[in-house]
Structure formats: C-alpha cells, structure tokens
Amino acid sequence: MNLDTTTIDSIVAQAEVAIAQASDPTALDQVRVNFLGKKGLFTEQMKGLGKLPKEEKPKMGQVINIAKQAVQKLLTERGELLRAQEIKEKLAAESIDVTLPGRGTQIGGLHPVTRTIARIESFFGDLGFEVKDGPEVEDDYHNFDALNIPEHHPARQDHDTFYFNPKLVLRTQTSGVQIRTMEVEQPPLRIISPGKVYRNDYDQTHTPMFHQVEGLMVDKDVSFTHLKGILHDFLHHFFEEEVEIRFRPSYFPFTEPSAEVDIMGKNGKWLEVLGCGMVHPNVLRSVGIDPEVYTGFAFGMGVERLTMLRYGVNDLRAFFENDLRFLKQFK
C-alpha cells in the first residue's frame, strides 16, 4: 500500500464504517485495535514514513496524526453512545414500578423488663441516685453476713439459694452491691443497683432468675419520712396515676424498722410491690460507718412484678419465653 493522502483517506473511511457497525463496546474496542493498535493500519503507515524523501516526512506524518485523531474522536463518540444505550437497556430491564406498595420494615423494641428498669433508673437518676453494678456470683459474706443474715437464717438454706460451694452463691438480691459500695465510698450515698438475682423457685409468679432494683441512701439525719416520700412519688410516677399506697410493718434482717409497700389494685385488693426500711445499725457497722452519726434507708423491688402490674401481665414466665406475639405488644 502506497503511503499518500489518498491511502490515509481510505483508511479513515474504513474506520468510519467499522465504527458505525460496532454494536457493543467489545466490538468497538476491536475496531480500535485494528486501526490504532500496535499492529493496526495507522501504525503500519507510520512505519512507512522512513521510506519517504526527507522533505515529505513531516507533512505526511502530520496527515497521519490528524487522521488518527479523527478516528479516535469517532471511537470516543461511538463508545459514549454505546454505553448510554447499554445503561438505558439495563434500566429498562430492571425498571421499578413506583406504584407498587412499599415493603414494611421490621422495627424492634425494648423488652418490657428493660423498659421498666430504664424507667426506674430515670426517676431515681433525677433524684441524684447513681447506678451501681456488682457480681452475680457472690460470696456468702456480701450476700448474707454483711446484711445481718446469720448462718442459721432460713434464707441461707439450700432449697432457697443456689450454692456453688458453702462460701459462694448466685446472689439472692442485689444488696451485696450496696455493701461493696459502702466499703469503698463514704456517706453521703445515693445509689440504686439493678440486676439479675437468683432463687430456687418456679411458678406463675416466680422464676429461678429475675430482676431486682435495690436502692440505698445514707447521710446524716435521714429518716423514714424521707423514704416514704420518695417511694410515694416513685409509685405515682411509675404507674402514671394516683395510686392508693400503704406501708405495712414487716421484717427484714438488714433494716429496722422494716415495711412492705402495697398499692390498691383495680380489683379492690392490696398488692405488694416492694420492701423497704431503715438500714440496720449492724449493717452500717459492718462497713465501718458509725450509726450514731449516719442513718440510711434501703428499698428493693422486683422488676418483673412491677412490669406485670403496669402492663396487666398475669404470668411472669411470659417475659422469658421469647414469644414475639407477646413481646411485640410493648413497642
């Protein structure tokens, strides 16, 4: 093939036809290789420049470069067109009917027990009570002895308590957290200790594992009046209504005097909701606090019990059966 402008024009014309006939990006790329590649037609023409007279080389080289640029422009334009067509076809194949109804999203919710604990923490947090935590596997000193529960007390018997060995138990209340706090912190103290506790019992109103929140306040001149006022406000806040409340004398080894708190149910009967009392002097002495200087009150409530009363649940075991039909009611 002679190297002249006619030849170059012919190659450009061939390229135009080949580019126009390329139906997809792969075919177009093959056209590029055939004309502009290392072994393409334009490369062969460039090699022929060496055979031309010296004065003709620059002019012919310029002609070839202009032709190559023209072909490259055609390739680029055709490539953009093919890619646009490809995208259009893909969108048409994967089109979305915006008139179809949307798919609902499954939204989770907090477990009712978790909701109750959060509600309790929020109320007492506003009163300056700190949330404290402690071990669920507890030694007998912090679970019993320091709480004025002697070795012969019924609460320490095997049928009520889960023992690992004679000195190690699954805690039966979160009161051990109060002892551990008073061992390392000095009054004034305001704490609550929510957490899991364990007792060997299982029926409609009891499970071997349940949740408890215990509270403690120790300071100078703390009285039973303070305790009654705080618990009275808490119960009205928790149930979001004016509930009738009574304090009934009771006995707990770690408080003196002690009381149980009842509320009037919708059926006209009193329902026990928590226990409380003034911290026993022996408990204060066990942690190095002088009961002649400081006094305090303590209270404890079963979270599941309060949750049952708030939401009208009859069987405590429903909280632990993972039945979504039940749990979805509390979103």
From Swiss-Prot:
SUPFAM superfamilies: Class II aaRS and biotin synthetases, tRNA-binding arm. Its EC number is 6.1.1.20. Transmembrane segments: none annotated. The keyword Chaperone does not apply. Its main location: cytoplasm. Mg(2+) binds at E256. It is found in: Cytoplasm. One of its GO terms (cellular component) is cytoplasm. Its cofactor is Mg(2+). It comes from the Bacteria. GO terms for biological process: phenylalanyl-tRNA aminoacylation. GO terms for molecular function: ATP binding; magnesium ion binding; phenylalanine-tRNA ligase activity; tRNA binding. Keywords: Aminoacyl-tRNA synthetase, ATP-binding, Cytoplasm, Ligase, Magnesium, Metal-binding, Nucleotide-binding, Protein biosynthesis. It catalyses: tRNA(Phe) + L-phenylalanine + ATP = L-phenylalanyl-tRNA(Phe) + AMP + diphosphate + H(+). InterPro entries: aa-tRNA-synth_II, aa-tRNA-synth_II/BPL/LPL, Phe-tRNA-synth_IIc_asu, Phe-tRNA_ligase_II_N, Phe_tRNA_ligase_alpha1_bac, Phenylalanyl-tRNA_Synthase, tRNA-bd_arm. Pfam families: Phe_tRNA-synt_N (PF02912), tRNA-synt_2d (PF01409). PROSITE patterns: AA_TRNA_LIGASE_II. Binds 2 magnesium ions per tetramer. Tetramer of two alpha and two beta subunits. Belongs to the class-II aminoacyl-tRNA synthetase family. Phe-tRNA synthetase alpha subunit type 1 subfamily. This is Phenylalanine--tRNA ligase alpha subunit. It comes from Colwellia psychrerythraea (strain 34H / ATCC BAA-681) (Vibrio psychroerythus). The gene is pheS.
